[in-house]
Each structure stands twice: as structure tokens, then as C-alpha cells.
Swiss-Prot record:
Pfam families: Ribosomal_S20p. This is Small ribosomal subunit protein bS20. GO terms for biological process: translation. Gene3D superfamilies: Ribosomal protein S20. It comes from Shewanella woodyi (strain ATCC 51908 / MS32). NCBIfam families: S20. GO terms for molecular function: small ribosomal subunit rRNA binding; structural constituent of ribosome. Belongs to the bacterial ribosomal protein bS20 family. InterPro entries: Ribosomal_bS20, Ribosomal_bS20_sf. Residues 1-27 are annotated as: Disordered.
């Protein structure tokens, strides 16, 4: 347990940040899951709409440092490839 005043404050801030990041990460996963669900259902229009909603969220989370920018790019590329395969 933290003994000094500053260590206690850091522990509180760390926990607060952890909960905030967990919430953001959960939201991000929900957006990605919506796209995947639409792809698996075979609904190109819904998949495209969900992807367009998820794209800026992925970019924002990468900018904020929640996920790595390469991970965001990888998610977007793979989802987009699967959506394009639906149209073909």
C-alpha cells in the first residue's frame, strides 16, 4: 500500500485512469463486434455503415494511446477487406 501522500494520489489517479481506459476499450470492442456481426450476417449495407462508425473511433483511440496506431490500421484494413469480399 502507498505510504506517502504523493504515492496515495498516484494510486488513486492510476485506478481512475484504468477504469476510464477499460470503458473506452470496451466501447471500441463493441464497435468492432458490430462490424463483424454485420459481416457474418452477410449484410453489406449494415457492415459498411457499422465500419464507417467504427473507423473514427479506432483512429481516436490510437491517437489517445489506448491502442497502437498499427493495431488500429490493422483492424481497419482487415475489416475493410472482409466488407469488400461481401460486395463481390
Amino acid at each position: 500500500m502507498a505510504n506517502s501522500k504523493s504515492a496515495k494520489k498516484r494510486a488513486l489517479q492510476s485506478e481512475k485512469r484504468r477504469q476510464h481506459n477499460a470503458s473506452r476499450r470496451s466501447m471500441l470492442r463493441s464497435y468492432v463486434k458490430k462490424v463483424i456481426a454485420a459481416i457474418q450476417a452477410g449484410d453489406h449495407a449494415a457492415a459498411t455503415e457499422a465500419f464507417n462508425a467504427a473507423q473514427p473511433i479506432l483512429d481516436r483511440m490510437a491517437t489517445k494511446g489506448l491502442i497502437h496506431k498499427n493495431k488500429a490500421a490493422r483492424h481497419k484494413a482487415r475489416l475493410n477487406t472482409r466488407i469488400k469480399a461481401l460486395a463481390a
